[in-house]
Amino acid sequence: MLTYDNWEEPTITFPEDDPYKGALSVLKWAYGHYGDQLVYACSFGIEGIVLIDLIYKVKKDAEIVFLDTGLHFKETYETIERVKERYPGLNIILKKPDLTLEEQAEEHGDKLWEREPNQCCYLRKVVPLREALSGHPAWLSGLRRDQGPSRANTNFLNKDEKFKSVKVCPLIHWTWKDIWRYTSRNELDYNPLHDQGYPSIGCAPCTSPAFTAEDLRSGRWNGMAKTECGLHE
């Protein structure tokens, strides 16, 4: 089994010119290789909805983890409920941080995300994901290369130094148009905020509509020297 500890650059190749740009082949390999030990950490944005639909073709009881920071839009929680109805076999887990928002405010001050967004993301996303991935050799992510410079060199299979794991990214060759074309063709239900100028959706206090079509993540942490929540750095 390919793991972080015995990592070697994978020699396996996946087709990039098939209708799924390799995504379905990657998922079949990953679930065949890791089985129930493979976890998908999903934000339930549009890429997540597409990837869940593809996952369901391969493993109908897959484990999906949502990092429930307690700060998400109500539309995001409503989207999760609709996903549960459409894919009843999935094991969708809402992983909460150790600290409630009230406890975090007591320890670190009110609205930590406004003063120390990196610390807030660490407490409410990074630590919970580390706990969720404990004992799992690999996890799935919906990263795409065209999401921005920090993701441009992502491979199908990646040695993940942050979580000491193997990060599997089936959608790396999908474009924004590919995502929406698949969504339309398969009549997928998605977060309505995408239709209101939010191509990338995270916690409500730190997410605004995108300011430029060239940078789909330009609405995240607006006005701050921050582009990632810490999960993919």
Swiss-Prot record:
Gene3D superfamilies: HUPs. Induction: Up-regulated by sulfur starvation and repressed by cysteine. Also induced by O-acetyl-L-serine (OAS), a direct precursor of cysteine, maybe via inactivation of a putative transcriptional repressor of the cysH operon whose activity is controlled by the intracellular levels of OAS. [4Fe-4S] cluster binds at C120, C121, C203, C206. Binds 1 [4Fe-4S] cluster per subunit. Pathway: Sulfur metabolism; hydrogen sulfide biosynthesis; sulfite from sulfate. GO terms for cellular component: cytoplasm. One of its GO terms (molecular function) is metal ion binding. The active site is at C229. Pfam families: PAPS_reduct. InterPro entries: APS_reductase, PAPS/APS_Rdtase, PAPS_reduct_dom, Rossmann-like_a/b/a_fold. It catalyses: [thioredoxin]-disulfide + sulfite + AMP + 2 H(+) = adenosine 5'-phosphosulfate + [thioredoxin]-dithiol. Keywords: Cytoplasm, Iron, Iron-sulfur, Metal-binding, Oxidoreductase. Its EC number is 1.8.4.10. Its cofactor is [4Fe-4S] cluster. It is an enzyme of class 1 (oxidoreductase). It is found in: Cytoplasm. GO terms for biological process: cysteine biosynthetic process; hydrogen sulfide biosynthetic process; sulfate assimilation, phosphoadenylyl sulfate reduction by phosphoadenylyl-sulfate reductase (thioredoxin). HAMAP family: CysH. Belongs to the PAPS reductase family. CysH subfamily. Catalyzes the formation of sulfite from adenosine 5'-phosphosulfate (APS) using thioredoxin as an electron donor. This is Adenosine 5'-phosphosulfate reductase 1. It comes from Bacillus subtilis (strain 168). The gene is cysH.
